[in-house]
Amino acid sequence: MGGSAPGQSPYQRLSQRMLDISGDRGVLKDVIREGAGELVTPDASVLVKYSGYLEHMDKPFDSNCFRKTPRLMKLGEDITLWGMELGLLSMRRGELARFLFKPTYAYGTLGCPPLIPPNTTVLFEIELLDFLDSAESDKFCALSAEQQDQFPLQKVLKVAATEREFGNYLFRQHRFYDAKVRYKRALLLLHRRSAPPEEQHLVEAAKLLVLLNLSFTYLKLERPTTALCYGEQALVIDQKNAKALFRCGQACLLMTEYQKARDFLVQAQKAQPFNHDINNELKKLASCYKDYTDKEKEMCHRMFAPCDDDSAVGEN
């Protein structure tokens, strides 16, 4: 007869319907929800949610699911469990899977006292939200400018796009300094690369996106002068770009250059008259300018108002 043998533990019963992905049944997998696209590459940085469980325990001993935005982890560097590395390499974007890791692929014969007992098989539920393959980008950026010039333009554009994707991820995590570094790497690649006239528009389009990212990032870093610089570079490429005009307006407002801020924001509003952010920024500008003029009037009033004490002295 089929079915589980009497006396088997929950993990033993579960293991019978799981796929062996290590070849020695040290890492077993059960797909809960299928993913899509390519498998995770060996040098990828992954964005995952995970929870680790001991047998007979309902609460996880380890989990990152409480974080609003999990941090990006690079395979081979940031992940300490061999079983998790192997498991992730079998996954696709959007996949949710359950894994059993034998001690060899988890915490070994000693365990991790007092949390993990010796020789313990652990269960992990892992959801692969996304992954970015930085190996190609890292290798390319390490080359000299002369070596990079030997590659076709599409290669440069792909690497620059990867750097920008990393920057976007770091920006969403509010790691603005790290995001800036990635964006600058992308921009340097695009600045160094010459293209034939018929393909120059591809380079300019890629530059525009990165310049807008840099302008916004420097606003977040509270460096409006630099934000304005990158915004104006974006306007050289596309002088009517509403987002570039908006960023320049924001930067000028922070610098208390109210007339310049108004000029940029009015142009942005002409391009996108129903844009909520632009209209709100114009209201903010009006409020800031009113406060500024009120303070100026008050200061002038104090400077030129007659002094009662002096008047009294003059009368004596």
From Swiss-Prot:
<dbReference type="InterPro" id="IPR019734">
    <property type="entry name" value="TPR_rpt"/>
</dbReference>
<comment type="subunit">
    <text>Interacts with HSP72/HSPA2 and CLTC. Interacts with GAPDH; leading to inhibit GAPDH catalytic activity. Interacts (via TPR repeats) with HSP90.</text>
</comment>
<dbReference type="GO" id="GO:0051321">
    <property type="term" value="P:meiotic cell cycle"/>
</dbReference>
<keyword id="KW-0943">RNA-mediated gene silencing</keyword>
<feature type="domain" description="PPIase FKBP-type">
    <location>
        <begin position="43"/>
        <end position="132"/>
    </location>
</feature>
<dbReference type="GO" id="GO:0000795">
    <property type="term" value="C:synaptonemal complex"/>
</dbReference>
<dbReference type="GO" id="GO:0051879">
    <property type="term" value="F:Hsp90 protein binding"/>
</dbReference>
<feature type="repeat" description="TPR 3">
    <location>
        <begin position="242"/>
        <end position="275"/>
    </location>
</feature>
<keyword id="KW-0802">TPR repeat</keyword>
<comment type="function">
    <text>Co-chaperone required during spermatogenesis to repress transposable elements and prevent their mobilization, which is essential for the germline integrity. Acts via the piRNA metabolic process, which mediates the repression of transposable elements during meiosis by forming complexes composed of piRNAs and Piwi proteins and govern the methylation and subsequent repression of transposons. Acts as a co-chaperone via its interaction with HSP90 and is required for the piRNA amplification process, the secondary piRNA biogenesis.</text>
</comment>
<keyword id="KW-0221">Differentiation</keyword>
<keyword id="KW-0539">Nucleus</keyword>
<dbReference type="GO" id="GO:0034587">
    <property type="term" value="P:piRNA processing"/>
</dbReference>
<dbReference type="GO" id="GO:0030154">
    <property type="term" value="P:cell differentiation"/>
</dbReference>
<comment type="similarity">
    <text>Belongs to the FKBP6 family.</text>
</comment>
<dbReference type="GO" id="GO:0007283">
    <property type="term" value="P:spermatogenesis"/>
</dbReference>
<protein>
    <recommendedName>
        <fullName>Inactive peptidyl-prolyl cis-trans isomerase FKBP6</fullName>
    </recommendedName>
</protein>
<dbReference type="InterPro" id="IPR042282">
    <property type="entry name" value="FKBP6/shu"/>
</dbReference>
<dbReference type="GO" id="GO:0031047">
    <property type="term" value="P:regulatory ncRNA-mediated gene silencing"/>
</dbReference>
<keyword id="KW-0963">Cytoplasm</keyword>
<dbReference type="GO" id="GO:0005737">
    <property type="term" value="C:cytoplasm"/>
</dbReference>
<feature type="repeat" description="TPR 1">
    <location>
        <begin position="160"/>
        <end position="193"/>
    </location>
</feature>
<dbReference type="GO" id="GO:0005829">
    <property type="term" value="C:cytosol"/>
</dbReference>
<dbReference type="InterPro" id="IPR001179">
    <property type="entry name" value="PPIase_FKBP_dom"/>
</dbReference>
<keyword id="KW-0744">Spermatogenesis</keyword>
<dbReference type="InterPro" id="IPR011990">
    <property type="entry name" value="TPR-like_helical_dom_sf"/>
</dbReference>
<dbReference type="GO" id="GO:0006457">
    <property type="term" value="P:protein folding"/>
</dbReference>
<keyword id="KW-0677">Repeat</keyword>
<feature type="repeat" description="TPR 2">
    <location>
        <begin position="208"/>
        <end position="241"/>
    </location>
</feature>
<keyword id="KW-0469">Meiosis</keyword>
<dbReference type="GO" id="GO:0141196">
    <property type="term" value="P:transposable element silencing by piRNA-mediated DNA methylation"/>
</dbReference>
<dbReference type="InterPro" id="IPR046357">
    <property type="entry name" value="PPIase_dom_sf"/>
</dbReference>
<dbReference type="Pfam" id="PF00254">
    <property type="entry name" value="FKBP_C"/>
</dbReference>
